[in-house]
UniProtKB/Swiss-Prot annotation:
GO cellular component labels: nucleoplasm; PeBoW complex; preribosome, large subunit precursor
Protein name as it appears in the record: Pescadillo homolog
PROSITE patterns: BRCT
Organism: Cryptococcus neoformans var. neoformans serotype D (strain JEC21 / ATCC MYA-565) (Filobasidiella neoformans)
Location of the region described as Disordered in the Swiss-Prot/TrEMBL record: 306-341, 485-535, 565-585, 601-632
Name of the gene: NOP7
Coiled coil: 595-632
Compositionally biased tracts (Basic and acidic residues): 576-585, 605-616
SMART domains: BRCT
Biased composition (Acidic residues): 307-328, 492-516
Molecular-function GO terms, alphabetical: ribonucleoprotein complex binding; RNA binding
Low complexity: compositionally biased ranges: 521-531
Subunit structure and binding partners: Component of the NOP7 complex, composed of ERB1, NOP7 and YTM1. The complex is held together by ERB1, which interacts with NOP7 via its N-terminal domain and with YTM1 via a high-affinity interaction between the seven-bladed beta-propeller domains of the 2 proteins. The NOP7 complex associates with the 66S pre-ribosome.
UniProt KW keywords: Coiled coil, Nucleus, Ribosome biogenesis, rRNA processing
Subcellular location(s) of the protein: Nucleus, Nucleolus; Nucleus, Nucleoplasm
């Protein structure tokens, strides 16, 4: 006879433990348990049957996996938490006895918990760390902009933490400027979105996107729990430090980069740090030792440069061949390739280093230009963007007047974000040719990866719509904006023919709209909706309520509904009737629950289509009005 199982020793009661049971098992406080769970990535679970998991009790409780709590028992941070608890007791006793020397010694020997092992556990590979770098960068930047004054009723964020966050953000931007890895940016409501391309393991690029708030005074809300945020920040600071060390080491740079105190006191953020290359290791005989990593990186750079050169040569050969003879395409001989390789000079270590030090694909869009940032623009944002794209930045013209400044001759573009008169522009230029633009021009050039025309971006002009470069990742496609760009680039050719065609189309559209308006004026809107979809009970009920509000009798309402249904049926083509019949057959085969869900989906789709049509008509009306204003 089988042994009877005891209650609570198997199943959900064994797999799950409540939070109170976990606290007793770990012998720590609730605050330490929360901090430990955040650092280790453990979160509450939802059992299928809470009553069974709670051993028959129906009291509300938070549940965790039993294996997760067993895993926490071996965490080295538990020892640090207990040491900190003992330290707090000793420090409180010393302060109570006014033993200030002992209190200072205890403060100097305060136990500090290191989180390096947690970063290695949670991110075993460098690519995984890069894929999860968005939240750390967002939080680190948020704390770098917090005020250092006390928050009423809250714990003050230490100034050392804010300074370290500012340093990490500056080091990250400095690396992006050095490698020219900026790819996209967007000026949103919350702030400025950036996207960089970071080389991961094996040379595979990883896209890292983060958000930086605008430079406004931060008002910290009172309902924010800074203890939880600081716990996340401790982990994220360590993680960002790991990533930056790896990135700087791969670029043969010293990390952390040294800080110029004088420039830092002058208010320079990124420019206060100096990039210093690491010295090559020397052996006992004084010769330079070459590491395997440096050789692999140099070979990879040579391969990339060779591939680019081959592609360029192939494209050039194809273009010339197509111009001479489109039917014949000449291919290079394999024997010739072998002779070229055999006759080529041998590759030396110095040539390897020279090739690897200059990346094959650098994003140097603004390299020929020098930008002057006006006082009202955000120097932190636009200096980073311009320098990351290879350009030069001037933030101040040291002279009594801008025209007399010694560095004014090198300026090619002026970024200004306020209206300015033509006389003032000519006075500042003093005979020079400067391009006056608004900041959006820089962002649009970065997103399109090319220098676009500055027309329409002048000071005080109405800017074109600033679109998100990530629109293709799930949002609606808006082809008319591309059509506008093509029309602006090609010029206005054949305007008279287009105007005549537009007039004909407008007349036909007006006739169709007049016919629709006549039908709409004859019947109320709810009645028309019910006539278009007679099987929808909700639309029929809404039409009945509308008729009752208008004082129409039930018999008259039925007659109007029947007549409107007939009118709509005449306009419906045969293909739509067949489609409607197929949908009805599908609904017959559905269960009642699925049929209701299907009706809800169809209703939401109709609402979206109606809203889309409404916005489309509004857009066309605005375009027509703008075209008329431009002609006038």
């Amino acid at each position: 006879m089988a042994k009877i199982k005891k209650r609570g020793e198997s199943g959900a009661a064994k797999n799950y433990v409540t939070r109170n049971q976990a606290l007793k098992k770990l012998q720590i406080s609730l605050s330490d348990f929360r901090r430990l769970c955040i650092l280790k990535g453990i979160y509450p679970r939802e059992p299928l049957n809470k009553k069974r998991a709670n051993k028959g009790s129906s009291a509300p409780a938070s549940f965790y996996y039993h294996k997760d709590i067993q895993y926490l028992l071996h965490e080295p941070l538990l020892v640090k938490f207990r040491e900190h608890k003992a330290f707090a007791k000793k420090l409180a006793r010393a302060i109570g006895r006014q033993e200030w020397g002992l209190a200072k010694n205890l403060e100097d020997a305060k136990p500090v918990a290191r989180l390096d092992h947690l970063v290695r556990e949670r991110y075993p590979t460098f690519t995984l760390a890069l894929q999860d770098l968005q939240d750390p960068l967002n939080l680190v930047h948020l704390f770098s902009t917090l005020p250092t004054n006390p928050i009423p009723g809250k714990t003050l964020v230490p100034s050392e933490v804010i300074a370290e966050c500012s340093r990490l953000i500056s080091e990250w931007k400095l690396w992006a400027i050095r490698t020219h890895s900026l790819r996209k940016m967007f000026l949103g409501i919350k702030g400025v979105y950036y996207e960089c391309e970071v080389p991961g393991q094996g040379g595979e690029p990883v896209r890292v996107r983060w958000l930086e708030g605008f430079e406004f005074q931060q008002h910290v809300p009172h309902d924010v729990d800074f203890r939880i945020l600081l716990t996340f920040l401790d982990l994220y600071r360590t993680m960002v430090g790991f990533v930056l060390f790896k990135l700087y080491t791969d670029e043969n740079l010293v990390y952390p980069p040294p800080l110029d105190v004088e420039l830092d006191e002058q208010g320079e953020s990124v420019g206060a740090f100096k990039l210093v290359e690491r010295k090559a290791a020397e052996g006992a005989d004084g010769k330079t030792q070459v590491s395997k990593k440096a050789v692999r990186k140099a070979i990879k750079g040579i391969k990339a440069a060779g591939d680019d050169a081959d592609v360029d040569m192939d494209e050039g050969a194809k273009e010339t061949d197509e111009e001479e003879d489109e039917d014949f395409v000449e291919r290079p001989s394999k024997a010739q390739e072998v002779d070229d390789v055999a006759s080529a000079p041998l590759t030396t270590y110095n040539s390897l280093l020279a090739t690897s030090s200059t990346p094959a694909r650098q994003n140097l869009l603004f390299s020929p230009y020098t930008f002057y940032l006006s006082r009202e623009t955000s120097s932190r944002t636009w200096e980073f963007v311009v320098r990351a794209m290879g350009g030069k930045v001037i933030t101040s013209l040291t002279a009594p007047t801008p025209a007399d400044a010694p560095n004014a001759d090198s300026i090619t573009h002026v970024i200004i974000d306020r209206p300015i008169t033509v006389e003032r522009m000519r006075e500042m230029e003093a005979g020079r040719k400067w391009v006056w633009i608004q900041p959006q021009w820089v962002a649009d050039c970065v997103n399109k990866q090319k220098i676009i025309s500055s027309e329409g971006y002048g000071p005080g002009q109405l800017l074109p719509p600033h679109l998100s470069p990530w629109d293709g990742e799930g949002e609606l496609y808006r082809p008319w904006l591309e059509e506008q760009g093509e029309k602006a680039a090609e010029g206005q050719e054949g305007e008279e023919e287009e105007e005549a065609a537009e007039q004909d189309e407008g007349e036909s559209e007006d006739e169709e709209e007049d016919g629709k308006e006549e039908v709409a004026a004859e019947y109320p809107p709810a009645l028309l909706a019910a006539a278009q979809n007679p099987s929808d009970a909700s639309l029929l009920h809404a039409a009945e309520l509308e008729a009752e509000t208008n004082g129409v009798s039930h018999s008259a309402f039925r007659a109007q509904l029947k007549e409107a249904t007939k009118v709509h049926a005449k306009k419906v083509p045969a293909s739509q009737k067949e489609k409607k019949g197929e949908e009805d057959l599908r609904k017959i085969m559905m269960s009642n629950k699925k049929a209701k869900l299907y009706e809800k989906m169809q209703y939401s789709n109709r609402e979206k289509a109606a809203e889309k049509e409404k916005l489309e008509k509004k857009r066309k009306a605005i375009e027509k009005r703008k075209a008329k204003e431009a002609k006038a």
